[in-house]
Amino acid sequence: MRAATKGTAMRKIVFMMSVSLDGYFEGPDHDLGWQLISDELHGHFNEWLATAGAFLDGRVTYELMASHWPTADQDPAASAPVVEFAGIWRDMPKIVFSRTLEQAGWNTTIVREVVPEQIAELKARPGGDLVIGGSVLASAFWAHDLIDEMRLYVQPVLLGRGRLLFQPSDVTLRFRLAEAQPFADGVVLLRYERLRA
């Protein structure tokens, strides 16, 4: 693939995740049932994700998505946003970072580890932004300061326990609030851009 031409903005690595008010992305026993995903919010997800250049996932996130989305639009009870996203997911190029996954379908490439030089090359290619949707993979990207933007969908709930979105770290990273958008169900998008010296 061709690198981005001079004067063309390099595409970004964007971390997208729903999070509770007290900082959890997952409840006890991997519970995600507390997340409010209205048709309005799902439509918003679809509009933005359709512009992406690729989805970047770890093995667990990829296998979760691959177990549902390839045929989700065949369910007669599926809402219009669900039907739309099934097509987006199938068609979107996907990169799975995994040391153990041997095969992956649905327009998916397997990469064994996060190598900063390879990520820089990926960002320099033309196309839409690259979207990370899993916390473990995001941690590997944070370790190399590779994430350019966060899209946090803050859910109006206190979970009390579960898996925290951000693990303890000795590194301080600063961000600029680029957008705040409330939705009717009480979810708020907070979009932050990484500030680099």
Residue ranges with predicted function:
Residues 1-197:
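Enzymes that bind and transform nitrogen-containing heteroaromatic metabolites
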